[in-house]
């Protein structure tokens, strides 16, 4: 005897999974990331090379004791195993590439970022592997620093739903804008010149 409740639950779960995955990998520009002039959201997250084991969520707290966001402000969480937006901003202009590591077009964007990074030593480049573990982030095979946003908190703060999303930040942490979808090397160069 089949149980309609079980079948309905399985169907609803499959539908929810499809909608979630489609949102992450969609080419549609429902969200465009941060816009020029938006405040730079602080974050601190483990690098893919960190020794953190188990669930290592990013810190997006702006003050002490903010529960799941973090027990201390994200800007104060620093170290050789941490990717920190405040630290990046203090060191000059930078580019953040948000990628969903299983999606090939996201992975493909990293090669162009590496090429452009070589030509612009005064601009820092970093990758955020969205909803990834350290192991998943390490599969990206890039020379750029890769942080992993295990629970998607940073992607949420940066309004990321499409992969790849690139956020360009000028000196002093001024957001210059974001792009959604893959960019050519020439398009990357144009954006990087705006912030350098």
Predicted regions and their residues:
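Flexible, glycine-rich phosphate/dinucleotide-binding loops
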Residues: 52, 104, 134, 175, ...
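Proline-centered helix-kink/hinge sites
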Residues: 41, 105, 111-112, 145, ...
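Extracytoplasmic
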Residues: 38-40, 90-93, 122, 163
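N-terminal targeting signals for export/organelle localization
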Residues: 1-70, 196
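Short active-site neighborhood of thiol/selenol oxidoreductases, capturing the structured segment around
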Residues: 57-108, 113
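Structural microenvironment flanking redox-active thiols in thiol-disulfide oxidoreductases
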Residues: 91-141, 150-156
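Thiol/disulfide oxidoreductase modules built on the thioredoxin-like
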Residues: 138-143, 148-196
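Structured segments of extracytoplasmic/periplasmic soluble domains
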Residues: 46, 109-112, 116-119, 182, ...
């Amino acid at each position: 005897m089949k149980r309609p409740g079980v079948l309905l639950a399985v169907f609803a779960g499959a539908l929810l999974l499809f909608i979630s995955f489609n949102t992450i990998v969609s080419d549609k520009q429902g969200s465009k990331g941060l816009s020029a002039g938006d405040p730079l959201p602080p974050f601190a997250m483990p690098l893919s090379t960190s020794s953190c084991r188990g669930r290592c969520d990013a810190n997006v707290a702006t003050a002490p004791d903010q529960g799941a966001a973090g027990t201390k402000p994200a800007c104060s969480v620093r170290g050789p195993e941490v990717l920190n937006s405040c630290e990046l901003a203090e060191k000059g202009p930078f580019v953040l590439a948000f990628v969903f590591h299983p999606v090939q077009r996201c992975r493909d964007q990293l090669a162009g970022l590496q090429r452009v990074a070589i030509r612009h030593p005064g601009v820092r480049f970093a990758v955020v592997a969205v909803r990834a573990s350290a192991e998943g982030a390490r599969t990206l095979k890039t020379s750029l620093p890769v942080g992993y946003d295990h629970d998607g908190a940073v992607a949420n703060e940066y309004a990321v739903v499409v992969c790849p999303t690139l956020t360009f930040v000028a000196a002093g942490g001024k957001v210059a804008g974001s792009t959604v979808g893959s960019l050519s090397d020439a398009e990357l160069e144009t954006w990087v010149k705006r912030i350098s």
